[in-house]
């Protein structure tokens, strides 16, 4: 099988946004224009091509990122549609890791919204070049320049229009191209009666002003244009395009375009912008990795001639073919039926079949090349974030980091038959989703599942019922609290047992202290002179790690602390690993009395959008939920309240908001950080956990 499109003519892009900005509809239109779909599915009718799980079609939201291949202007475009709902952050995180560029979709009425900020931050972390598509220009209250302003104010982004709309709301009828200085007029709803022509006289001055601003913004990050600009030379269309491309790929500039995907306006120019300004796999730096032992830094260039390397970014259970592993090829080629090494797990895997995906229909292919995104059937041990590579040229590519779950609930199978099936279902769902955890509570024997939010767990329980036919009773949601130390102490833990014959002996002195937020647990061995033999040191660390999960105040995991092993003693005959493990956990227990142990709770960044008349009530309600109002903005006729509120106080908020605003208020929340729980509430939590 020969390569169909050159690497230079390949684009791997994601479509990302806040919920309801119109991402899935935008992707649908792209597929329609690139000839992949003949009839278009509307999201609100539950017939969209990209949203193929039953729950997605019922709820009209996108949960899993479907990967699709399309063709446009002699290029292959691989598109990943990512969910905008905050509970599915992990889907966005893993798709961004394997993309070369992205289209950020904004709602023209709202501009940048909370989830846009989250996704934008994630894309910046991974250095992903972006184009911004301001969608829904036909919506009441649509305001293009306001939306562009929110990119500057909320994201501090160097984003500038390369198009201007003619008209807005129901008068939106044409788009001005500021690079080529021409206009595209739309004659009908389907976007088929399209004509190109001169910019209407009454819009000419505005277009010239914004073209000048565009050149000015590009010149500030591109020396070639800067020189010509300062010398007053004419900048040609080709030079301006090339400079915008360079600055966009360098993640120093973000071109802004507009349209309304639902009415087919602005979709073709968007596809052209993807080709013109977003990078091909050869325009982005070679991917970095390490040798298997971690000692040597390696890199893999985007080329078919390099050894094969790929990153698995999603695992799914498919009803027809079983386990599907989506992967992005960074270098080399791979034939179906061949063997690869999973270097992250040290396992050899056979790639049974390779499928090219189109939302949820698929086409079998015999070979993949550098830059491709495809799905493999037959991989047994591979999970999200694993590296697959050539067996003779091992490399481990940088993996992904996933946030910790913040909310839990108990699930109990309704019958014995459900119990066995539930175990398998939970295992499969955990393989698919790294932010979903399931464990058995050792004290109550209940199965506890944890995830990123109520909707996240709701959908997973729903999938257990539909896909795995497991009926279960679900408990009320619980907050995932954490514990930490606020002060330092040096403590001893000594475990001795003499019971005839060989005894047990372990003795450690450990300095415990608070660590920086987000740094987790750090262990340092500062033993000198062999007072504890080297072979027992790992047992001390293991004993501490085991005890951390059980907590010291109310049974919640202990985070962000340092433990420095400074002294101890051992017995030639009686000492063993178990004794040192127990001694370490005794030291931690002692430290909890001296280190000012506290309970931490997840704090959520909440944004509430409400009509002005409800402002007082809503702010009062936020304060009554122990929230702090951090700012307010006017957005059209609405007020936007930004606040930091404990997750524990946000359960059922959707219902409260709905009744307080007669259904006119909306809110969104994202996890922000952990904060100490007030003493009175901590006392209640401890009491409840001890069953008093």
UniProtKB/Swiss-Prot annotation:
Classification via PROSITE patterns: G_TR_1, G_TR_2
InterPro entries: EFG_II, EFG_III, EFG_III/V, EFG_IV, EFG_V, EFG_V-like, EFTu-like_2, G_TR_CS
Domain of life, source organism: Bacteria
Cellular location(s): Cytoplasm
Gene Ontology cellular component annotations, sorted alphabetically: cytoplasm
Membrane-crossing residue ranges in chain numbering: none
Binding site for GTP: 17-24, 81-85, 135-138
Gene3D superfamilies with a match to the protein in the record: 3.30.230.10, 3.30.70.240, Elongation Factor G (Translational Gtpase), domain 3, P-loop containing nucleotide triphosphate hydrolases, Translation factors
Gene Ontology molecular functions: GTP binding; GTPase activity; translation elongation factor activity
Protein's GO biological process: ribosome disassembly
Coiled-coil region: none
A Pfam family that the UniProt record links to this protein: GTP_EFTU
Role this protein plays: Catalyzes the GTP-dependent ribosomal translocation step during translation elongation. During this step, the ribosome changes from the pre-translocational (PRE) to the post-translocational (POST) state as the newly formed A-site-bound peptidyl-tRNA and P-site-bound deacylated tRNA move to the P and E sites, respectively. Catalyzes the coordinated movement of the two tRNA molecules, the mRNA and conformational changes in the ribosome.
Official protein name in the record: Elongation factor G
The gene coding this protein: fusA
């Amino acid at each position: 099988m020969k390569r169909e499109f050159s690497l230079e003519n390949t684009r791997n892009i994601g479509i990302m946004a806040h919920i309801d900005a119109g991402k899935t509809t935008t992707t649908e239109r792209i597929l329609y224009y690139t000839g992949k779909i003949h009839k278009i599915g509307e999201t609100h009718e539950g017939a969209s091509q990209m949203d193929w799980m039953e729950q997605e079609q019922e709820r009209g939201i996108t949960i899993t990122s479907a990967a699709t291949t399309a063709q446009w202007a002699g290029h292959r475009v691989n598109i990943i549609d990512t969910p905008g709902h905050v509970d599915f952050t992990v889907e966005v995180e893993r798709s961004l890791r394997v993309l070369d560029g992205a289209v950020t979709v904004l709602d023209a009425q709202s501009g940048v919204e909370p989830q846009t900020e989250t996704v934008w931050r994630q894309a910046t972390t991974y250095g992903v070049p972006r184009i911004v598509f301001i969608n829904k220009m036909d919506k009441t209250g649509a305001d293009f320049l306001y939306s562009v302003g929110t990119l500057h104010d909320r994201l501090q982004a160097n984003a500038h229009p390369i198009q201007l709309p003619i008209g807005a709301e129901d008068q939106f009828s044409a788009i001005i191209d500021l690079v080529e200085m021409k206009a595209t007029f739309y004659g009908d709803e389907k976007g088929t009666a399209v004509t190109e022509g001169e910019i209407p006289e009454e819009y000419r001055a505005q277009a010239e002003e914004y073209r000048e601003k565009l050149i000015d913004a590009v010149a500030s990050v591109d020396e070639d244009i800067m020189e010509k600009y300062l010398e007053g030379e004419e900048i040609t269309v080709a030079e301006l395009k090339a400079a915008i491309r360079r600055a966009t790929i360098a993640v120093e500039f973000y071109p802004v375009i507009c349209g309304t995907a639902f009415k087919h306006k602005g979709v073709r120019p968007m596809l052209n912008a993807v080709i013109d300004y977003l990078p091909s796999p050869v325009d982005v730096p070679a991917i970095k990795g390490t040798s298997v032992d971690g000692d040597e830094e390696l890199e893999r260039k985007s080329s078919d001639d390099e050894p094969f390397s790929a990153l698995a970014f999603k695992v799914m259970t498919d009803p027809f073919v079983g386990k599907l592993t989506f992967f992005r090829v960074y270098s080399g080629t791979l034939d179906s039926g061949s063997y690869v090494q999973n270097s992250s797990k040290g396992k050899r895997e056979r790639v049974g079949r390779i499928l090219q995906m189109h939302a949820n229909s698929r086409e079998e292919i015999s070979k993949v090349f550098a830059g491709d995104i495809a799905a493999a059937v037959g991989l047994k041990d591979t999970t999200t974030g694993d590296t697959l590579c050539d067996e003779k040229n091992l490399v481990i590519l940088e993996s992904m980091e996933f946030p910790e779950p913040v909310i839990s609930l108990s699930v109990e199978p309704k019958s014995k038959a459900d119990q066995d099936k539930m175990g398998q279902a939970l295992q499969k769902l955990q393989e698919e989703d790294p932010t979903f955890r399931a464990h058995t509570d050792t004290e109550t024997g209940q199965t506890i599942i944890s995830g990123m939010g109520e909707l996240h767990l709701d959908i997973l329980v729903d999938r257990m019922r539909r896909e795995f036919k497991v009926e279960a009773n679900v408990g009320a949601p619980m907050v995932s609290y954490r514990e930490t130390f606020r002060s330092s102490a040096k403590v001893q833990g000594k475990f001795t047992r003499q019971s005839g014959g060989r005894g047990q002996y372990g003795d450690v002195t450990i300095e415990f202290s608070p660590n920086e937020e987000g740094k987790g647990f750090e262990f340092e061995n500062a033993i000198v002179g062999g007072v504890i033999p080297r072979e027992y040191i790992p047992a001390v660390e293991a004993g501490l790690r085991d005890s951390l999960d059980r907590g010291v105040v109310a049974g919640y995991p202990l985070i962000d602390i340092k433990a420095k092993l400074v002294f101890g003693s051992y017995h030639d005959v009686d000492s063993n690993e178990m004794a040192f493990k127990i001694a370490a956990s005794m030291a931690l227990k002692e430290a909890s009395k001296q280190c000012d142990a506290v309970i931490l709770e997840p704090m959520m960044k909440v944004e509430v959008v409400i009509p002005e008349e409800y402002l007082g009530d809503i702010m009062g309600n936020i304060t009554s939920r122990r929230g702090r109002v951090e700012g307010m903005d006017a957005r059209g006729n609405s007020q936007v309240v930004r606040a930091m509120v404990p997750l524990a106080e946000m359960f059922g908020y959707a219902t409260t908001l709905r009744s307080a605003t007669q259904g006119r208020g909306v809110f969104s929340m994202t996890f922000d950080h952990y904060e100490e729980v007030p003493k009175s509430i901590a006392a209640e939590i401890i009491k409840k956990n001890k069953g008093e």
